[in-house]
Amino acid sequence: MEEIYAKFVSQKISKTRWRPVPAGSLQTADTFATGSWDNEENRVSLWSIGDFGNLDSDGGFEGDHQLLCDIKHHGDVMDLQTLSVGQQWTAAHYHTSPGSLSCRSAPCTGVVCSNPEIVTVGEDGRINLFRADHKEAVRTIDNADSSTLHAVTFLRTPEILTVNSIGQLKIWDFRQQGNEPSQILSLTGDRVPLHCVDRHPNQQHVVATGGQDGMLSIWDVRQGTMPVSLLKAHEAEMWEVHFHPSNPDHLFTCSEDGSLWHWDASTDAPEKSSLFHEGGRSSIFLFHSISNQANVHQSVISSWLSTDPAKDRIEITSLLPNRTLSVNSLDVLGPCLVCGTDAEAIYVTRQLFS
Amino acid sequence: MEELDGEPTVTLIPGVNSSKKQMCFDWGPGEMLVCETSFNKKEKSETVPGCPVIYIIRKDVDVYSQILRKLFNESHGIFVGLQRIEEELTGKSRKAQLVRVSKNYRSVIRACMEEMHQVAIAAKDPACSRQFSSQVSILSAMELIWNLCEILFIEVAPAGPLLLHLLDWVRLHVCEVDNLLADVLGSENPRKHESFWKLPGTTQTLTELELKWQHWHEECERHLQDGTFASSPHLESLCKIMLGDEAALLEQKELLNNWYHFLVTRLLYSHPTVKPIDLHFYAQSSLDLFLGGESSPEPLDNILMAAFEFDIHQVIKECSIALSNWWFVAHLTDLLDHCKLLQSHNLYFGSNMREFLLLEYASGLFAHHSLWQLGVDYFDYCPELGRVSLELHIERIPLSTEQKALKVLRICEQRQMTEQVRSICKILAMKAVRNNRLGSALSWSIRAKDAAFATLVSDRFLRDYCERGCFSDLDLIDNLGPAMMLSDRLTFLGKYREFHRLYGEKRFVDAASLLLSLMTSQIAPRSFWMTLLTDALPLLEQKQVIFSAEQTYELMRCLEDLTSGRPVHGEPDAQRLQDDDIETTKVEMLRLALARNLARAIIKEGSLEGS
């Protein structure tokens, strides 16, 4: 079983993100940032998992993560991204009430970067596009949504995708002038709020979302308005979903119910289907549940969009040893995974695929 | 209730002039609000208060310590784990599991102690350093007491192994051993003894051990009397010590830091097979001998003594008084309760001691801006008053972001606290309406299944439509789905929007019957009927006949209903007259259009097919 190190850090962790390693380098991730929430004084901290420990008998690294530095943060930390900036944009998100001139600040719920552009979304239903070197927002879409926008991700560079609290995915194209989304996708039925979204690293039309009922949905944005798969996952809100950046057949989700799951859709290794694993891991097999599958372009089949239930099984593993309070955030880079919980603990593992 | 043991401490509030003696206060759940007042009967002039701020006074400062937070979080995990495995704890493994839990708690305390010690050494400010050091000694005392309770109450070591456990206990807590004699006292002889004893659980019975020890003791005594060690006074006193001679032991008082070290050493040499029930005799005499009448016992001594006397309630009571935070007594009592050691006598307020302490601890957690999440689980495991306490506390958590609100709602929903869900959703929905986030407001009312609020939001939408002539937030209204059924007004809104859509798609017949059904089925509010009828005008004016005769009759009936029900106005003013004029014009136009349509419809229906 992968070694997973836990450390209690006296602050509830709302976000964790690995510092990106330069593309093409052989380095593994060694620094991550965390943001806290619900403290009178919140902090953004940088941690290192470098060679602080000694080599143990297996040649692995021992020692848990050490704090490098931290700074104060006004308000809860809602999202983290890495970029070099020299600006601070205050009052990017605000509420105005009709008939009054005063503005109340609104929480900004998500931020995503694609050097040098930064896109933010917030509870005020507003989308802002910033550039790293500009003082003012380059573009603002007011009232993009009548409900709260929970998360945002880039599809292709001029296009972003947002999810909101009435269960809709909206695609926005910055090349177009209007304030309307170019496409809206949603699940009919109950309007379950969607909390997180992530795009497949290689196939830009495959998107995964997680909802308030813990359901994981895989969407193909070229096809229709319904999700391709709906997978019953967690018992409570799913806070984050991530495709592994270099092994996109692996997906990770974390939830309010205190668990972190590793979804493995790779179909090549037959031994993965064995039920005999070392203790501490619970593996479940699950078939895809397909709804509304239009004709998929056959030459590019992602294992997430495949239609053959007999061939495609997803292996799900729970990575945390005990049930804890909500796991708010996770990030994966190479063989390393980090996650943070409301029990004020950070878990790190460096051997995801052991 | 017991009387206080001492004078209450005086706390000065900075900035407030305490000589004027004018302050007012109010109690909160875990703290007190204090501010300066100035009730001055003699002078009527306005005086500026000397201190214009309100102070919050808390007794429990531990909750705000960064290092102790780790203690709270880790022990929360252990606590919840213990409650969850309760059903599985049966038979022989039960004791071993409970001992393991106890050791987990202790290791958490030790980890905290280590960290605080590091911080105390590294602190630059001496006052800070002193504060941390005193915190370290409190933690050390807690671990000492817990360890003893583990040996006596949870492990329930019988005579024989009891002494070994007590030896470990003392060794763990005695740091300074740097003298040869002290070495002998501390380590060498016990080792000799251990090889003598072997490990507990072996085939040797207590009587066998006792015989062996007796034999060895007699031999020592013989050596002493024969004067074998007469040449060396050190060796002689060593021999006396090994015989358990109290006077000899007391001579080494500086090496024995405290009376319980003295006790265990004494037992080691004179009564190694002491039975648990006899412990307190030796404990009391050790304490008296050690203190020698010079000083009086400290709170820690009393607690340990109560433990030796197996008076669990006294231990808990004394700890509650001595410590400033409920953490220790709450967790220890809970663990002892799992060992089925606490009698279930009820306290004054109807719950038993374990529950009382857990409630106090959890309430203290709720007073903290961040640790309230831990408190929830503690309330869950208080069968009598836990749920009610949770209901009261959870509504009062300030909700600054939606994310926090979602977590609180999830906690309420998991425990079926529908009232709290409703009230929290209502607060959030109101905030959303005030911020003009109608979509958010609607999703909150859907979550709470609050039909009344959904009606309110729908009215807002309809009002916006009337004012602006178009719908805002079409993305929401177009995609209501089954949530539309939540309230009649919401259903109306959805259907009305559908009417507009049908009209836009030029499906006039469908649009017409939908419009009519909106009025006849009574889901349209009366105030809106005029708008609906006005919407019908373009349909009536179309070249082809859209409304059938039957439908036209219905429309006319609706119009008459509307106009006849209009109340007589009081004093007409200019605006009203103008409005009335517009109204009358509209009504006339409608009547005309309806009549014309009726005529055409009758003719069309009366004609043969195909004509």
Segment roles from a protein language model:
Chain A
Residues S114-V192:
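Solenoidal tandem-repeat scaffolds enriched in leucines and small polar residues
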Residues Y5-K7, C69-I71, G99-C103, R139-N143, ...:
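Short C-terminal beta-strands that terminate individual repeats in beta-propeller domains
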Residues M1-M78, Q88, E237-M238, P245-L251, ...:
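Terminal intrinsically disordered, low-complexity extensions flanking WD-repeat/beta-propeller proteins
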Residues E180-H244:
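Eukaryotic tandem repeat interaction scaffolds
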Residues Q11-V21, G75-T82, S102-S114, S146-L155, ...:
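Canonical WD40 repeat/beta-propeller blade segments in eukaryotic WD-repeat proteins
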Residues N39-V44, T96-P98, T109, D124-N128, ...:
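Short coil/turn segments within WD40 beta-propeller repeats
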Residues G50, A132-K135, F174-Q177, V221-G224, ...:
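Short loop/turn segments that connect beta-strands within beta-propeller blades
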